[in-house]
Amino acid sequence: DYLHKMNPRSRVYGFIGGTSGLFEGSCIEIQEETLKLYRNTGGYDLLGRSADKISEEDYEKVIASCTKYDLDGLVLIGGAYTATDATLLTEFLLNSGIKTRIVVVPCDYSRDLKNNFVETTVGFDTYCRTVSSLIGNICTDSRSAAKYYHFIRLLGRSPSHVVLEAALQSHPNYAIISEEVAAKRMTLLQV
């Protein structure tokens, strides 16, 4: 919306499959009609995503896509690896004389990018809210089956932030922080 307000002739492309689409030059033009269906819902199902790290061999493919679509800017959405890739790719594009500028939108549920410049990342609050809701549902169901124990494991490189946030919202009987257990070398009986 903002881009078209500033310049109605602007075009926005989305690369299908994330960086793999960028490498292959496979994209669609994002138009108002298409975007209406996905507004405020995320959008992974619109374009898909990939977890590819950009290698030096891929740089030339990125240049080909940037040139083919005459891109003034390239927005990468992701976590720490994406930010690192964007930094290296930016240097390469600058040294190659390509006009495309790169912007990174931090999106990472594990808060790996939180620092003095990034207060929070897109995805963390949504992830915590969703996890808390699911844990709350399980807590409600478990009241009717008191003879069973329910264990919920949250995944990630360092899920402690999510565990603590979800525990504050859903009030489970126990919340075990795996980093603390590992640091103290606790056994199952000690936990």
Can you annotate each of these PLM segments?
Residues 10, 72, 173:
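Short acidic/polar active-site loop segments enriched in Thr and Asp
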